[in-house]
Amino acid sequence: MSRSAEEVEATLQIAKVDLEDLRNTVHCLTFSSDFTSGDYSLMELDDTLCKQIEAGDSLVIRGDKSDHAVLCSQDKTYDLKIADTSNLLLFIPGCKTPDQLPADQQPLTIINCEIAGFSNHYWELRRCRPKLKKLKKLLMENTYNGPENERESQDNSLHTTEDLLNMIQASNEELVDHLKAIHACSINGFWRLLDFDYEMKLLNHITQLIDSESWSFSKVPLPVCLQELRSLEPEEMIEHCLTCYGKRLIDEGTGGDFFALDEDKICRATALMLLQNAVKFNLAEFQEVWQQSVPEGMNTRLDQLKGLALVDRTSRPETIFLLKTEDLPEDTQERFNTLFGMREKWAEADIAPYIKDLCGEKQTIGALLTKYARSSMQNGIKLYNSRRPLS
């Protein structure tokens, strides 16, 4: 139902509102004939997401029925939370805001608008960590152990990038970055994890060749490496292993590709090989065997094992055992409960590698410890224990 200018002025008089205090444009609102509540949802976006939507990019809501839904852009993941409003929010196509109206509009103008929907809540977005724990478990169902060990029928347990995006709560960039971090390899369009023993076999071929050719670890020529090892393993596997344990560079003189191997990554992988089948390892014996096991010229250090292994200085003799960050719960409180269940008190240097990935944007490890742990001094060392009683 539309209103005349006279009816609008009469309503303003009843409300004791002076027309001169208002703009000379009035919106007359009516409900749409096909209006039904609950047809629309509102979502609050920051400037970055707004620009992505305006540019034609997509936002995707991901999660199984049992998951808490998250929203993903191309490179970030956001937690979705419903926020209630005290006022009813109306959806009015064609409604003009003050900046869209002329300042000196005369005379009184009436714009008839239909209310298409309403809501008393909206979706609030908060940046969160991608939920990637399930990814490695999926890929471990069918690891790659060399061409001679491939099964003929295995497509049901193989996954493309699109398959993984439908199962993992992460953005495309976060997913691909994590696939690279866990050394996954794209084989015939499917993402595969190399069997760890096979990966170490590839690495051993490379380090033995480096030794026989007297190459520097910082300059391993890719073409020669592929040519020498192609009779042993597929070239793409050799190159993948070099990518996992080194950095590709260009020789300024020849223009050829070469790799600079990362000592820390190779020492870390060797330690994992030694520790994975032992419950605990005498620390002194482990350090001796570890140094003997890495390629000659490389030096092992305990700080290479952050987030992979934990040293127990209280036992006699001192011991070391495998404790991987990726095996701990993703939820922050559950992570702290698990860690404090293993050890009542932690020094910051020991616990930091296991909670670093929990820090949000602009959040420090110290702030995280303040929130979830209590500190105390023992023999001049600050130690942290759980804020909550552990069941």
From Swiss-Prot:
Keywords recorded for this protein, A-Z: Cell cycle, DNA replication, DNA-binding, Nucleus
UniProt keyword annotation of Nucleus present: yes
Subunit text: Component of the ctf18-RFC complex which consists of ctf18, ctf8, dscc1 and the RFC complex.
Gene: dscc1
GO BP annotation list: DNA replication; maintenance of mitotic sister chromatid cohesion; regulation of DNA replication
Tagged with keyword Ligase: no
Localization, UniProt: Nucleus
Similarity remark: Belongs to the DCC1 family.
InterPro entries: Dcc1
Gene Ontology MF term list: DNA binding
GO cellular component: chromatin; Ctf18 RFC-like complex
Principal subcellular localisation of the protein: nucleus
Protein name per UniProt: Sister chromatid cohesion protein DCC1
Primary role: Loads pcna onto primed templates regulating velocity, spacing and restart activity of replication forks. May couple DNA replication to sister chromatid cohesion.
UniProt xrefs under Pfam families: Dcc1
